[in-house]
Amino acid sequence: GKILTLYKSYRNKYEGWVLPKGTVEPGETHEQTAVREVYEESGVHGTIIKYVGKSQYSFSIPEDTVEKEVHWYLMVSSGYYSRPQREEYFVDSGYYKYHEAYHLLKFSNEKQILEKAYNEYLDLKRSNLWGSKKYF
């Protein structure tokens, strides 16, 4: 029941705790991207349990506005070890309880997705499906 978060620090311009995410590579599905990015950014081997939803955001660069769409998945890992990907400016990573992760996260859209994913997790637990062979 803990949430993997990453701390990104990019040249003092971008700093804060985020959820793992990334860009779809040619020929990849959203699911493959999610599993690959979690591993690349944190060293964690995750297994998808359920699709949670998508979020959209944009940011400005000097010559344009970049639009992003992120597909989110509830995942499970076999342990609590993580290693931040320094090449992508991740300087820390860890697993946190829901309320800790919620308050750490920098972006409101990630907080909304976290809340939705956590409620999905609680529903599966209440139904005795979390950890069942149906999902593993």
Q: Model-derived features: where do they sit?
A:
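N-terminal strand-loop-strand
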Residues: 1-19
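Short, charged/polar low-complexity linear motifs in solvent-exposed/disordered segments
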Residues: 22-23, 59, 65-66, 120-123, ...
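Unchanged
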Residues: 24-112
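Charged phosphate-binding loop/patch that engages nucleotide di/tri-phosphates or the phosphate backbone
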Residues: 103-136
